[in-house]
Amino acid sequence: MTSASANLAHNLAATAQAQPHARAVILDDLVLTYDEVEHSARQLAGWMRAQGVGEGDRVALMLPNVPAFPVLYYAALRLGAVVVPMNPLFKRREIQFYLEDSGASLLAAMPGEDAAAAAGATGTRLLTVGPEGLSSYVHGDDAVDPVEEVVPRDGDDTAVILYTSGTTGRPKGAELTCDNLQSNQLATTETLLHLDSSDVVMGCLPLFHVFGMTCGMNTAFATGAALTMIPRFDPAKALEVIERDRVTVFEGVPTMYGAMLAAAGAAATPPDLSTLRTAISGGASLPLEVMKRFEETFGATILEGYGLSETSPVASFNHPDAERKAGSIGTPIRGVQMRLVGPDGAEVGASSEDDPQVGEICIRGENIMKGYWNRPDATAEAIDGDGWFHSGDLARRDEDGYYVIVDRKKDMIIRGGLNVYPREIEELLYEHPAVAEAAVVGVPHPELGEEVAAYVVLAPDAQADEAELVRHVKEQVAPYKYPRTVTVIDELPKGATGKILKRELRGDGA
């Protein structure tokens, strides 16, 4: 059914009408109200329309977390265009691939030679977002007639093309529909975060990533909560902003939680985070030791969940009104089904201590992408004939229906024919007081196929040698599981969202 309300731009319009003077976006001393963001989005939509952008056209946004991002995001959606978020750290080759693959007609980016060169090479119009933001397009010489009405969209129309990280080849664009994103933000808002207009959401997750886009920006703008931004995550800055803006909801990936703990420990004065009521973690498994220390230090409850770009992203969560099981990713959210399947495709049952059952997570529901942009074969491989999306993640399910991630299918180590799940070993390393971060990977071995190797970052002023860390794990697991090497490094390689890039540790580029 085609309607204006299916279009995500309706959320901003409705909130601006209901509470025009409420804070929408905060970036240090800059505060924009919902009326100001809505006015700017109408003006920018008019400018885009004057450049020939229309319904179904792709608009690429290559911006950090700055107020221009939500303005341009909702402006493009208002026209019925499709948003293509991009990492602002991309170089020319990466930018050019995204523009060519998506067929974007417009690229919005910060000033830079790479963006200009890629736009020129692909014939893509470039909108440069300078230090003054978008003022010239809203109030100045470039301003044109605004788009007053939200273009009606069908629920199955593509709203966003979100490219996967490309860990197994070139990135693929997941087509997320209006219904995908609306249902996911509604379920997140109403059943997980319980957001309302009194809340302040911390926007330090990149808005070009589905976690920050849906759980941060879309939920805030649909409920009238304020979104306070950090252009690039810095743990000390995050603590400062939580205290200054009285943040109530923090959303992060596991490495952010560890970094904030370290920053709090190094601060001359303990930060006042008393307003923080809920923190949510996703993107990777949160070490239990980090969860415990964060909650003890800051007094906020962490709810761990699970999702992917292809699932808009939230698929399951530890629901706040149900039992929380630390270390689990909870149960499926409203409108979503999950199950586990084995290598033969048969469904895997519940696990018990005597009978552990591991299978690949498969997901079906309102959150599943339409498909991969212009890649029907990849779509057919990922989504089976019954509508189940195959995630590539391994998990077990307990008798209460709670799922526990075991590992990425591709990250599982097969040592001499025996399966080793890196997360189990990482959890043990995190229990050592000297370890701040840990990652375990499989490395080639001429006889065993793969050997277990660990990389760790030590906590500030901590000391531990390889033998001590190997012994710490060896004493607690079967002989085939413990790492034969533990390498201490200054920093683990991470992606834009803070997720640890194990492929770089393996050195295989996979």
Per-region residue spans from a language model:
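Gly/Ser/Thr-rich phosphate-binding loop
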Residues: 244-252, 261-324, 337
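Conserved AMP-binding/adenylation subdomain of ANL enzymes
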Residues: 182-200, 208-249, 263-264
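Conserved ATP/PPi-binding loop(s) of AMP-dependent carboxylate-activating enzymes
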Residues: 331-335, 346-382, 420
